[in-house]
Amino acid sequence: DLFRSATNYVTYYEKKTGGSVTFGRWFSEYVSGSVSLFAEEIKYSDPQAGAPQLILNQIGNQTTTGFRLSLTRDTRDYPMDPRTGWRTSGAFSLGTPYLGGTNDFYKYTLDVNKYTPLPFDTRLSVRARYGVVTGLNTNGENKPVPLTELYFVGGINTMRGFVFGKAGPVSTSNTLLGAASELIFNFDYIFTISEEAKLNGDIFFDYGKGFAGDSVSTPLRSAAGLEGRWISPFGPLRAAYGINLDPNEGERKGVFEFTIGQIF
């Protein structure tokens, strides 16, 4: 696979160019795994005035080379709209200068999701995620973790009811800093609105946080709300409104988001 992307994170601008070679296989009916070798060139530019030093330290060009491993066990009855089953996955990434890159880090993430069928064609989804990324010091340079590898907790795919990344570390000026670790719990009570139209409703409660270091501490952040899900001919569509249950000063009390092409 080859890729090229450009993203405006408001505080800085990111351009990525690279490629990967992936080898994958099924070990059984439910278990699959893969290993990827990758190389990417990253350029951070155009920092916002007053951007934190953490961001300013990474402005310029970087190269990441390394590998990624993943292992997944999936027993869900219908992955696009499950009623029952488990999905458990683990992933590990290593960026190393021994393969020619400038970045030096390791990252691992665990993700467990359980679906339980309930009466009247409803179901309960409970999901837990934990991840850590840590910079290494192979050549004594003590390089920071690339911004693109940090966790940004907050938004429709992590903590609904929060603006993207705002359930994790932010600066005194409310600028996203990214997290070195994350712990997230999502509880979803899903009910069918129209089986023919493949339209579902969802009452959710999210509980989690992103952390500046690799240790997890309480209290976590919390949000609750409503979501609509439609398995459309163009792919899954989701629209969610979440309420921040304990907003800090300057935070929004509610956030509406919409996404297409990804299930949760």
Regions found by a protein language model. Give the residues of each.
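Surface-exposed extracellular loop regions of Gram-negative outer-membrane beta-barrel proteins
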Residues: 1-3, 68-118, 199-201, 226-230
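Gram-negative/organellar outer-membrane beta-barrel architecture
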Residues: 1-82, 86-89, 160-161, 165-180, ...
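Transmembrane beta-barrel strands of outer-membrane/channel proteins
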Residues: 1-4, 35-41, 86-94, 110, ...
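Flexible loop/turn segments at secondary-structure boundaries
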Residues: 7, 42-43, 97-99, 132-138, ...
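Feature captures outer-membrane beta-barrel proteins of Gram-negative bacteria and organelles
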Residues: 17-25, 67-73, 107-116, 148-153, ...
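Outer-membrane beta-barrel channels and translocator barrels
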Residues: 24-30, 76, 117-121, 192-196, ...
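Extracytoplasmic gating/loop element in the C-terminal half of outer-membrane beta-barrel translocons
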Residues: 120-204, 210-212
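C-terminal beta-signal and adjacent terminal beta-strands/loops
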Residues: 205-217, 234, 264
